[in-house]
Regions:
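Long, structured stretches of catalytic cores involved in phosphate-ester chemistry, encompassing
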Residues: 1-104
Length: 104
């Protein structure tokens, strides 16, 4: 996705217009060095829930405003759990979520 903010979305079949799927997560982050702007309205087909979002109040916000993000993912070698984190331009973690490994 071409995004200029960061967000964690959970897609839930119980809330979806089209419910024939397993629930899933979407993590988006950006940009690395460009103007920032917020999200568009989410399509309700897959029942999205915005669990976390950090975006500027105005479009085309300068990178100097500090709203630049990237994501990090770590897999625990023992449990195989996946941890996803959003990090800002200053190196601060602004969001973190651990997902349990499936099928173990």
């Amino acid at each position: 996705a071409d995004v200029h903010y960061c967000a964690a979305h959970y897609y839930d079949p119980a809330r979806a217009l089209y419910p024939d799927f397993n629930p899933f997560w979407e993590f988006v982050a950006g940009p690395l060095n460009a103007g920032s702007f917020g999200p568009n309205t989410l399509d309700n087909t897959f029942g999205p829930q915005v669990v976390f979002q950090k975006a500027p109040q105005a479009p085309n916000t300068s990178p100097l405003a500090g709203l630049q993000f990237f994501g990090e993912m770590r897999v625990d070698p023992r449990s195989r759990d996946l941890t996803v984190a959003f990090v800002d331009i200053n190196g601060a973690t602004v969001f973190e979520r651990t997902l349990d490994a499936q099928g173990r």
